[in-house]
Amino acid sequence: MMSEQVTAPVYTLRGLPLLGWRDMQHALDYLYADGSLRHGTLVAINAEKMLALEADAEVRSLIEAAEFKYADGISVVRSVRKKYPQAKVSRVAGADLWEALMARAGREGTPVFLVGGKPQVLAQTIEKLKRQWNVNIVDAQDGYFKPEERAALFARIRDSGAQIVTVAMGSPRQEIFMRDCRLVHPDALYMGVGGTYDVFTGHVKRAPKAWQNLGLEWLYRLLSQPSRLKRQLRLLRYLGWHYTGRL
């Protein structure tokens, strides 16, 4: 089945259209079927991003410009289900989608370019991707480059022929990078992946599966990093939107 034939419903939260993937397999089939990969930018949407959209016009324009916005946070999935009771939408965590996409890229021989992360973490990520899924990494660049080196890096990405470009720089830096790089190399699938390389290489622990399944990943992070409290308190505003139906 060609990827053009795989569709996904679109649900709107606070004016933001989100792809409604049923599960990981649906996400992969939507993005990537029979070697025909969609071109565009993937952005994971969680409650924190929903708040940032309201607070920052630049963030809103960056995220609105991305073609593929999907529900990465459990609270966003719950809001979609509340607003659209018939919706068959599931959480597709960005870190899991990236791994699934890399496994698929390995099978298909798709050229991949990795951007971001610390040099040591990036090197370990490349080594593990090649060992685990035989991923065709055509080139990579850690996150430590100067603004004046961006144009040369964009040209490197274009000249590498990469069809998947994953960018681990945190928001909104990674979204700005992807927007600008696409002007030079539009024929690729771009994915912002935050701290995914750190998790993949074991430098940062994710919440255990049981916590994830209960939708308590945020609590696990808070208990392991109390400095996140201020960030988490901001999310109370999102809960207010959810429970008062302002979505």
Swiss-Prot record:
Tell whether Transferase is among the UniProt keywords. Answer: yes
Q: Which Pfam families match?
A: Glyco_tran_WecG
Highest taxon in the source lineage: Bacteria
- Tell me its EC number(s), please: 2.4.1.180
Q: Which UniProt keywords apply?
A: Glycosyltransferase, Transferase
One of the GO BP terms on file: enterobacterial common antigen biosynthetic process
- Is Hydrolase given among the entry's keywords? no
Reaction equation(s) it catalyzes? UDP-N-acetyl-alpha-D-mannosaminouronate + N-acetyl-alpha-D-glucosaminyl-di-trans,octa-cis-undecaprenyl diphosphate = beta-D-ManNAcA-(1->4)-alpha-D-GlcNAc-di-trans,octa-cis-undecaprenyl diphosphate + UDP + H(+)
Q: Name one GO molecular function term.
A: lipopolysaccharide N-acetylmannosaminouronosyltransferase activity
Report the CDD domains cross-referenced here.
Glyco_transf_WecG_TagA (cd06533)
Its pathway, per UniProt, is: Bacterial outer membrane biogenesis; enterobacterial common antigen biosynthesis
EC category name: transferase
Role this protein plays: Catalyzes the synthesis of Und-PP-GlcNAc-ManNAcA (Lipid II), the second lipid-linked intermediate involved in enterobacterial common antigen (ECA) synthesis.
Protein family according to the UniProt entry: Belongs to the glycosyltransferase 26 family.
- The protein's name is UDP-N-acetyl-D-mannosaminuronic acid transferase
Q: Which organism is it from?
A: Cronobacter sakazakii (strain ATCC BAA-894)
**Top-level taxonomy:** Bacteria, Pseudomonadati, Pseudomonadota, Gammaproteobacteria, Enterobacterales
